[in-house]
Structure formats: structure tokens, C-alpha cells
Amino acid sequence: VLYHYEYTTSLTFATDDPAKAAWQASVPELAHSHDFLVNCVLSVASLHLGRLHEDKIQKTNMNAVAASRMNKALTTYRPQLGNINASNAAALFASSTLTAVYLFRTSAIDIETLRETIPYGTIIPPAGVVDKMMSCILRTVWGLRGPLTVLMSGWNHVINGAMHPVAARKWWPSRRIPATLRAEEEDQRLRNIDSLWMDTNKAWDPQTRHLNDALAHLREAYALVSQLTLTGVFPSMTAVPYAVDDTTVGILTDRGAIFVWSTLISREFIHLLETKDRDALVILAYYAVLPGRVRNVWWLEGLGADFVTAIAMAIGIENWHLIEWPAQVVGVDLWNAFGVRQDRLMGKPDELHMDVI
């Protein structure tokens, strides 16, 4: 499993060579001194092997190993978050990021398991199933708070340590503006979302500030992604195929850009998501487009479609028109969400610029 991590799994976490080197060489080195990181590495590598196995029993076994290792990691990892220092910051940052990857992948697995319990052709599943689907989605949102916690408390230690290439993004543009005509059109779509609350009697509600902030951060995330898919502007890297406009596949220079939003939204906004606030869930559905457009990354497979499907079930048929565009982009037919899925999780033949490892 460790061999698989070093030569295969580690290369799927980053798009640039310095960061790949950190995952491939520095993380195993850090793991020598931190058992929790060893278990995180074994967990995610097992999960990756489970993804690659065709045999269902082997797949189930590897996923069980992954869960066991992650549970062991968390028992020793969590207590150390209260004392982040020079000796453990890099290992904690690596562990928290691997935990996020674990949560992304297991959320997709758990939702697939739930889908198998839903009769073919169901339009809206029972409320209990919808709650479980939303719980899976929110797990991924919370997942990225782990790396954020480490960075906020131990930034100087991380930025000066072995994980510096993973944490630092000095070359990102400081001014986030839509970089193409298509990006400007999508920004207009995002801008229009605030009419759901600003043009109603909810405009003065306390929660409005959190909705506005989350939407503003999402507009910046879309703009950043549009800037990082421009050709020949930013550092040349082993980048990831990204469906820029749902038909043309560009190259996203750094997929880390799609995760920024989850680290910026407030806890109050996350609480709105947990209480199934319609307007917050619409914003989340538009966010789902970003991971939904990434191609050929095993731990992001299906995530965009899962987000939109769960959100659609939570907000009800009467509100489906509000998420029609995100559903179309990620390939989800809302009226046939539990039939044969039509989304292009693995990309079309001409999109396979990078093998699915």
C-alpha cells in the first residue's frame, strides 16, 4: 500500500511538480516521526486501490481498510491540533489535507450506496435518504476546514517547511476578475442569485450578510478559475483537464483554486446549509459546477453531480428552476436523477489529456 502511495496516489494530489514532489517524497519522510500521518497515507492509498479494483469484494475490503486507518489517524491527529508547533505543523497540514481527500471520495461512495437503495425512476426519495445525502455533501464542506485550521494556527511553520509547495500560491493573480467572455456571462449568472433574498422581505434578515459574503467569495472563485485556465499566462505545469465551458476542455493550472471557497465561507453560512436554507443551497449548487467540471481526478469523481442531486432533493421540485443551470453543467437530469446517470465523470475520449491513474 505504501508503494502504491509513493508511486501512484501521491501524484494525484497536485498539478505542479514541486507540490507533487512534496506529496511523493516529503510526506513519507514526515510520516517517520508521526504515526497519524502514516495512517492517513495508508488510508487514502487504500481508498485509491479500492477505486481501481473491479472486483466488488476487493473494493469493499480496501474501503474498509481505508476507514480503519483513518479512524486510527484521527484519534492521534485531533489532540495535536490544540498544540500546533514547528515540529508537527507540516505533518498536521499533510494529514488534514489527506483527510479532506478521504472525505471527498467516501462521500461519493456513500452517496452511490444510497442511490442503490432508491428504486429506479424515483423522483424524490424519502426525507431520511435526502438527509443522509445532504450529510455526505456537508462532510466535504467541513473537510476543508481542517487544513484551514492548521494554516491559520501554524502558517509560518508550514510555509517554511516541507509542505511549502502545497500551501503557497504566490503566483496566483491578486485581482480576481473574469478572464473570458464566457466567465463574464457566468459571473452575471452568479450576480443574479442575490435577487432570491435582496428583492424580498428577507433583505434585512441577519442571515443575508452570510449569503452575500458566500456569493461574493464564489464569484471570486469562478473568476480565479477562469484566470487559471488561460493558456500561456501562468507557470507551465502538469495541469488537469477542466471543462471550461462544458464543451471545450481547457487546462486548469491549479485545481486548488476550486477549494478556496469552502475555506472562506462562514460557519454561519454552513449552518444555513445544515438547516437546508434554500438560498444557501442554491449558492452551493453553483459552487458544485467547479469540482463538477474537473476531469479525471479519482477523488473528485461524481462530486459535482452528487452535490446538485442532493441539493435538488432538499429544496424540492418547486425550486428546481433555480438550479437548472448547475444541473445542466454537471450533467444531471433532475427528473431522472435516480435513473442511469448521464454525467461525464470520466470525460470524453478527446478529453483524456491525463490518464486516470
Which role fits each region the language model picked out?
Residues F36-L37, S87-S95, L281:
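Alpha-helical scaffolds flanking conserved acidic
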Residues A21, A25-H32, I57-A64, G82, ...:
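Short, solvent-exposed segments of well-ordered alpha helices
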Residues E29, K132-I357:
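C-terminal effector modules of eukaryotic transcription factors
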Residues V44-H48, S95-I109:
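Short glycine-rich beta-strand segments
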Residues V1-G82, I311, K348-I357:
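Amphipathic alpha-helical dimerization/protein-protein interaction segment
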Residues N61-R78, F104-V158:
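Structured all-alpha helical bundle cores of eukaryotic regulatory proteins
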Residues H4, K72, A94, L98-Y102, ...:
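Alpha-helical scaffold segments in carbohydrate-active enzymes
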